[in-house]
Amino acid sequence: MKKIIALILSMISVMALFVGCSGKQNPPESSTPEIKETVEATISPVVYSSEAIKKVEETSAGNFEDWLGERSVYGMASNSVIESPFHTLKINGQDVPVYTARSRRGAHSFAWIDVEKTRRDWHVDVELTTAEKYGKCVVLPESTEVAVGISNNVYTCRLYAYDTYTFTFATDANASVTDPLLAPLTLMVTEEKPFKLPTEYETVTIEPGVHTGRELVFTQEFTAYIIKAGYHEVAGIKLPSNSLLYIESGAYIKGLDQELGLAVIGGEDINNVQIIARGIIDCGSMSYDGNKHPFWFSRVEDLSVEGLTLVNANTWTMCFCDCTNLTIERNLLLSYRNTSDGIMMSDCVNGAGRYNFVRTGDDGIEFKATGWGRGANVGYNCVYEYNDCWTDRVSAYGLIWENMRDLSNVTFRNNSVGFAYTSENGYLCPLEIRLGANSNITWKDILYENIELYYVDCATVITVKVSSSDGGGLGGGGAIVDSVTYKNISVNACREGCVALKMHFGEYAGGDITNIVVENMSFCGKVLTAEDKSNSSYFVNEAGDKFETGLTVK
């Protein structure tokens, strides 16, 4: 649980400390602290069949090293997910399967449990055993405040909340940070969502099997389409208005490389659509050509998406264009191919992405204004919050490149970055504004607030960049960036030479950069102040006067 601590003056000369997530005043020092009583939760693990997910020795590769070596930044790969060769997991004494997918840097394992809904406060007890012995275990994000006990190669802890918990390890107990190459495991803890048929809805059931062509292009409204647990091969699922897609726990959907233009799951010009899932979409057999997407919705009003696991995306993973009243919650994305951007909201209004875990081969979580949806929306009032993102190549949370329309009032709030690695580019970084398509377009009123970063292996933590390298005949290259605030940014550790912020304005770019504020940024233990603005170890000026007049540090 992410915690925000607020200091409140309650009486003259009397100061009381409140914890924001509980709303309760701390007792006086002389009183006995209140002990929170919880009950052991009833859990349901997400389990996939052996037909869908195999042990690594049962794959064509035959061993883990060769399986991992089948990665290609553009090409296809078989067996996108395997049973984890690294972990054995018990929760409340119950076996919970752990699965492993490839990432850009090594592999990433995952497990998922649903907690039965209860009116009482609950807990789950975790016992994780690893194939190797590690001296240190840190659960990310650190704001979850999980204390881990270690005994040889067994790691134990107690969890109290729906959240995303990633177990990371280091060989040395005294290591300053853990190592993302050492068997990271993300545990999704979510509330159980039993199927409930909406009033006056009919049902259509899709049994496991091969579904080619346009077999699953649905047109009947007021219908719940139920994907049964088991192994499916699917060319594409297209949803109509007033529909529910319910993907049962344990459903494994392998996308087929056919019916270009039809997403594995998608829809357009529709309204009132809900997707509830506890299943996997595997895009490992889909080639990269830009015409076949894992998940794409355009011009949709009232859309909610929850509970998907998407692996090995062949191109941009979850795309929402010109959508209004949108929620994207508790999804797990693990990909490594080039252009496998994670979650994109483009030209969306009243959108929210929450409690997602994203690790991809390109940008992680982003806002854009592409115009690709061909709708009338001007992006406004959207937020990403309580997400966890690791980046292996480009940005974690960004406003990236395609500025074809105006965009305003967008927020990244209460998010975390586990590990941020990028290609050797001086501007790619975890918190990134990088624009250059249209100098007449304004992106403004942008807020990054309460962002924690565990380890940054990039040239900079924050980039604000306007360039002119690709005008595309759309008003000339560049952008207008105005009123951006970075507030309460906390960087735990970074590589040598990493700076806090770099601002760049291209020599031939059009537009402007104005009103950039950095407030209360903790950079590897140092809180940055106005005096640090002139220190190039923290702030790099490649924007001339726009840096001098447009950036405020406080």
What are these regions (language model features)?
Residues 6, 29-229, 234, 240, ...:
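Extracellular "leader-to-stem" segments immediately downstream of a signal peptide or signal-anchor
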Residues 422-554:
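Extracellular beta-rich repeat passengers
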Residues 236, 261-264, 294, 317, ...:
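Structural detector of coil-to-beta-strand junctions
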Residues 22-24:
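Bacterial signal peptide processing site
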Residues 1-8:
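Positively charged n-region of N-terminal signal peptides that target proteins for export
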Residues 18-20:
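C-terminal motif of bacterial Sec signal peptides marking the signal peptidase cleavage site
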Residues 159-161, 212-220, 232-244, 254-276, ...:
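Extracellular beta-strand-rich solenoid/capping regions of secreted or surface-exposed proteins
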